[in-house]
């Protein structure tokens, strides 16, 4: 199973290792699933991870190291160009573009996200919520 993980799933999984997103990250760590990301997702994660610094005591250098490790473990693709009217929230276009690029290269089966705007596109694209993914694949 190869999946694109949205930034919100990565952040939740890192913040709460026993949560459903945390269980997905654990499956990735154990090699049960492969993850596809883009530099956009990695950069966004690098921007939002400082929110966890109070909870987990991460320094800026540790955050950089963590994101670099995730980049090494993931398949990194360049997001495909997506028309602005494809998504209600234009900020989600690079995430959708990451999924499309991965699908075009046969590198991913679906996008796992908690973003409601992206989930609304699930009839046109293989997009699942964290709960749907975990239920479907017994995670």
Regions found by a protein language model. Name each.
Residues 1-37:
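Short, well-structured N-terminal submotif of metal-dependent ribonuclease cores
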Residues 7, 39-40, 114-116:
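Short secondary-structure boundary segments
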Residues 11, 42-43, 118, 134:
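Alpha-helix N-cap/helix-start and coil->helix boundary motif
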Residues 14-15, 49, 122-125:
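Short, flexible helix/strand-to-coil boundary loops that buttress conserved ligand/catalytic motifs
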Residues 19, 36, 61, 86-93:
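Residues at secondary-structure transition points
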Residues 27-82:
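PIN-domain endoribonuclease scaffold, especially VapC-family toxins
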Residues 71-110:
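Active-site neighborhoods of divalent-metal-dependent phosphate/nucleic-acid chemistry enzymes
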Residues 105-112, 116-139:
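Acidic, PIN/NYN-like endoribonuclease modules and their adjacent C-terminal/linker elements
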């Amino acid at each position: 199973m190869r999946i694109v993980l949205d930034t919100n799933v990565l952040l939740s999984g890192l913040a709460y290792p026993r949560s459903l997103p945390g269980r997905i990250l654990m499956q990735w760590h154990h090699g049960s699933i492969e993850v596809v990301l883009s530099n956009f997702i990695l950069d966004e994660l690098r921007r939002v991870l400082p929110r966890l610094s109070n909870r987990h005591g991460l320094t800026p250098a540790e955050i950089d190291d963590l994101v670099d490790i995730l980049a090494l473990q993931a398949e990194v693709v360049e997001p495909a160009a997506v028309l602005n009217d494809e998504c209600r929230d234009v900020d989600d276009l690079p995430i959708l573009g990451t999924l499309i690029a991965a699908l075009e290269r046969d590198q991913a089966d679906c996008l796992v996200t908690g973003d409601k705007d992206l989930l609304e596109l699930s009839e046109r694209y293989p997009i699942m919520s964290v709960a749907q993914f975990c239920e479907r694949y017994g995670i």
